[in-house]
Regions:
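Conserved pre-ATP/AMP-binding loop-to-beta segment of ANL
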Residues: 93-95, 218, 233-256, 263, ...
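Conserved AMP-binding/adenylate-forming core of the ANL superfamily
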Residues: 31-36, 83, 97-151, 168-173, ...
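Conserved ATP/PPi-binding loop(s) of AMP-dependent carboxylate-activating enzymes
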Residues: 430, 443-479
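ANL superfamily adenylate-forming
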Residues: 103, 183-248, 358-359
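N-lobe entry segment of adenylate-forming
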Residues: 1-109, 113-123, 207-212, 220-225, ...
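Gly/Ser/Thr-rich phosphate-binding loop
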Residues: 308, 314-316, 342-346, 356-421
Length: 479
């Protein structure tokens, strides 16, 4: 076996949530713990609920298997509000969200400000007649308003979906026409690569293609046809708001496939399933807690955006950045992580490779005193990419190559805080995820043979189905 690039300290191991779980269960190593977790799904996900401090009525049953794996049920008797679970912590004046634009403009929002804004926005949505199950969409930048809007939709049981402003009108309409939204949030412009890009012409085209819209809300400015964000929410600033609870299978998100073989598939996710899956990842794969500040470079068109905002459920602070990752310089994302004293940084493998090809050494330029983890995803991180991070960015860091997808709004395989890092390797499968690599005939393959990465058992963030696929026929054909 090759020499490890990094190993956790004994102190870090003993403080980790996954080690504490091993101690509780009297299990000595991660592989045995993982095997236990996939052989005892009901008990594992019940523990994950408890240790994540999920607010709500858990109910008696944790798991009901099914012949067709995606039809298995988790917590069928549970009721909860996902937004409440993301915002209900003890913090008030501490910063919850830092939102940064490409030109350097920065907005910091405290936990109390975030709650107030979400409740105000939720009341504005209720005033528009938005009901549980209605679709509420955004074609918008990655900023605090988009997060507030999304959380408000979740708080009232609406189904939310987002698209990045770099999506052309045709791409947006291919997605949103299928789900018939009632509200749309957008921005008159966005910044990218040193330019301000006007969105109004494209917005008009999108709105004209969505006849079900009751209201279009525009960030920053007012136009005759569209209401300004501030004027929309201001009448509801002082209104009270009370969370309503929904079933575990209540839909919360619609994410979209790439659309390479036709119109993008509208993948419907149960909000509570995503909450539990991501809280389990945050707890056992990454050890994220209230001491963390997490920056993951993403747009609103990628599932990692949903992944990032659910970090709020760990009482951690998040950093949003809207703009080019390489403007005004190649190391812009590293600058943000340094300036914001981030503890966790999420990058694409492609971006790390761009840094590597520049042959720059960043160890003198950046100290990264608080940075504990760099996460890499989007594609395979090469062994050269691993070595570059340790030699040219920071040597004492957990480099977590992770893999998941839009289909599950989470990770299949990710970090393991108690194990060493080896070049070109992902540390292990997430707890509760029964992963294997199969050939075309469904046979399990040895570790050194390429095949299809497959999850063999049910987990909470499996999709509910495809929107509009009433008999689940297309869904069953796809999975």
């Amino acid at each position: 076996m090759s020499k490890s690039l990094w190993s956790p300290s004994q102190d870090a191991i003993s403080r980790s949530s996954v080690y504490k779980l091993m101690q509780t269960l009297k299990i000595n190593d991660y592989q045995s713990l993982h095997t236990w977790s996939i052989n005892n799904l009901e008990q594992f996900w019940s523990i994950a609920w408890d240790q994540s401090h999920i607010l709500g009525e858990k109910g008696e049953r944790s798991y009901i298997p099914a012949d067709f794996m995606p039809e298995a049920k988790f917590f069928p008797d549970a009721t909860l509000n996902v937004c409440e679970n993301l915002l209900s912590n003890k913090y008030k004046d501490e910063i919850a969200i830092t939102s940064i634009l490409e030109n350097g403009d920065k907005l910091k929002i405290s936990w109390d400000e975030l709650r107030k804004n979400v409740f105000t926005c939720a009341n504005a949505m209720l005033n528009e007649g938005v009901k549980p199950g209605d679709r509420v969409v955004a074609w918008a930048p990655n900023n605090s308003q988009t997060v507030i809007y999304t959380l408000a939709a979740l708080s009232i049981g609406a189904v939310t979906s987002t698209a990045s402003p770099d999506f052309a009108p045709a791409a947006v309409l291919d997605r949103f026409t299928q789900i018939k939204p009632v509200l749309l949030l957008s921005s008159p412009s966005y910044q990218y690569n040193g330019k301000t890009i006007d969105c109004l012409k494209s917005l008009n085209e999108i709105v004209n293609g969505l006849p079900t819209l009751k209201k279009v809300i525009l960030m920053d400015i007012s136009l005759d046809k569209y209401e300004n964000w501030d004027s929309w929410i201001d009448p509801f600033q002082d209104m009270s708001f009370e969370y309503k609870k929904f079933s575990f299978d209540h839909p919360g998100f619609i994410l979209f496939s790439s659309g390479t073989t036709g119109k993008p598939k509208c993948i419907v996710h149960r909000a509570a399933g995503v909450l539990l899956k991501l809280r389990a990842e945050q707890l056992f794969s990454f050890d994220i807690d209230e001491s963390d500040k997490v920056f993951f470079f993403t747009t609103c068109g990628w599932m990692m955006w949903n992944w990032l905002i659910f970090i709020l459920g760990s009482s951690a602070s998040i950093v949003l950045y809207d703009g080019s990752p390489t403007y005004p310089n190649l190391h812009r994302l590293l600058e943000i992580a340094e300036d914001e004293n981030c503890t966790r940084l999420g990058l694409s493998a492609k971006y790390i490779d761009l840094l590597r090809k520049s042959e720059a050494n960043y160890t003198d330029k950046f100290q990264f005193n608080n940075l504990k983890t760099i996460m890499s995803t989007g594609s395979v991180l090469s062994p050269d990419g691993f070595r570059f991070v340790y030699q040219n960015i920071k040597s004492d860091i957990q480099l977590a190559s992770i893999s998941g997808g839009t289909d599950i709004c989470g990770c299949f395989i990710a970090a393991v805080p108690i194990l060493p890092i080896f070049s070109g390797e992902i540390q292990g499968a997430c707890l509760g995820m029964a992963m294997d690599v199969l050939d075309n005939d469904g046979n399990s393959l040895p570790a050194d043979i390429k095949g299809e990465l497959v999850c063999l058992k049910a987990f909470p963030s499996m999709p509910l189905g495809f929107w509009g696929d009433e008999r689940n026929s297309n869904f069953k054909q796809s999975y």
